[in-house]
């Protein structure tokens, strides 16, 4: 069967390997497998969210409330915006897909940093759109602006991943706002803030307020419940923007796109302040251990404002080989070879999990 040419040439997103695969292919006992590849919450899911899931489970035969009234209201209250400024998606990446289809075509496209979340480029290809990226792997706003000015007629969406995945660096909020104000009104600036709860805790200057983004008219703030809220398996994300932007995106949203269990869990997760605080504090307490380990062993690392850390390996050690050897031991990390980096990205886990990573890396890199 023949498919459209652009489909034949599309690349698949490389997700972190599941625990089941490691058990099956390498014979590691399930209890010995540690997954630190996908930036999931190592503490699991909060009690309030779990309770909400159990309560909603008896209604699994029913379609969800398509208005998503409760979750939209909870997010609107949290951020001090109107419910008309909020859209809910099956993960924030679904909203990224909506945005690209709403703004891009064969004659224009997106602009990103050199190394950033790969789904931006993949969705651009879905829309047969162009993809401009900076030479710098990091978010250099000066370079991004220069590239935008030189291709202004061909760029309709600019993605800023704040903090950036997979590197972990983070722009200051004031610089992001200043940048957005310098961009033409018809060019949409997307603030992908999947890890912003972590960045805001580490440095208040990194905190981006969605209500400020709403005022700018040409920008949207994206958040997710997959990281600090511990709901990666339920796929819930959201966008906060001017009402006109949200209204346009709703025309692309399929009905019942987020399950009722997911909606109920997300509402409960927003209220679970103790779980959120515990998650963030564990993350940065353990992050210090990763930094100490890297300094002691001579590994270069990127200062991270997220729940992961990226280790840049020496040329004598290949990231693909190191990640494979870790995998054979039941330790799942993310090889960044596909991003053109000799590096591995490791989700910050629990103390015992992190100790195993350190012990194995010492053997492999020593």
Curated annotation (Swiss-Prot):
<dbReference type="GO" id="GO:0030170">
    <property type="term" value="F:pyridoxal phosphate binding"/>
</dbReference>
<keyword id="KW-0808">Transferase</keyword>
<dbReference type="Pfam" id="PF00155">
    <property type="entry name" value="Aminotran_1_2"/>
</dbReference>
<dbReference type="InterPro" id="IPR004839">
    <property type="entry name" value="Aminotransferase_I/II_large"/>
</dbReference>
<dbReference type="InterPro" id="IPR005861">
    <property type="entry name" value="HisP_aminotrans"/>
</dbReference>
<keyword id="KW-0368">Histidine biosynthesis</keyword>
<dbReference type="InterPro" id="IPR050106">
    <property type="entry name" value="HistidinolP_aminotransfase"/>
</dbReference>
<keyword id="KW-0032">Aminotransferase</keyword>
<comment type="pathway">
    <text>Amino-acid biosynthesis; L-histidine biosynthesis; L-histidine from 5-phospho-alpha-D-ribose 1-diphosphate: step 7/9.</text>
</comment>
<protein>
    <recommendedName>
        <fullName>Histidinol-phosphate aminotransferase</fullName>
        <ecNumber>2.6.1.9</ecNumber>
    </recommendedName>
</protein>
<keyword id="KW-0028">Amino-acid biosynthesis</keyword>
<dbReference type="InterPro" id="IPR015422">
    <property type="entry name" value="PyrdxlP-dep_Trfase_small"/>
</dbReference>
<dbReference type="GO" id="GO:0000105">
    <property type="term" value="P:L-histidine biosynthetic process"/>
</dbReference>
<dbReference type="InterPro" id="IPR015424">
    <property type="entry name" value="PyrdxlP-dep_Trfase"/>
</dbReference>
<dbReference type="GO" id="GO:0004400">
    <property type="term" value="F:histidinol-phosphate transaminase activity"/>
</dbReference>
<comment type="similarity">
    <text>Belongs to the class-II pyridoxal-phosphate-dependent aminotransferase family. Histidinol-phosphate aminotransferase subfamily.</text>
</comment>
<feature type="modified residue" description="N6-(pyridoxal phosphate)lysine">
    <location>
        <position position="227"/>
    </location>
</feature>
<dbReference type="InterPro" id="IPR015421">
    <property type="entry name" value="PyrdxlP-dep_Trfase_major"/>
</dbReference>
<keyword id="KW-0663">Pyridoxal phosphate</keyword>
<comment type="subunit">
    <text>Homodimer.</text>
</comment>
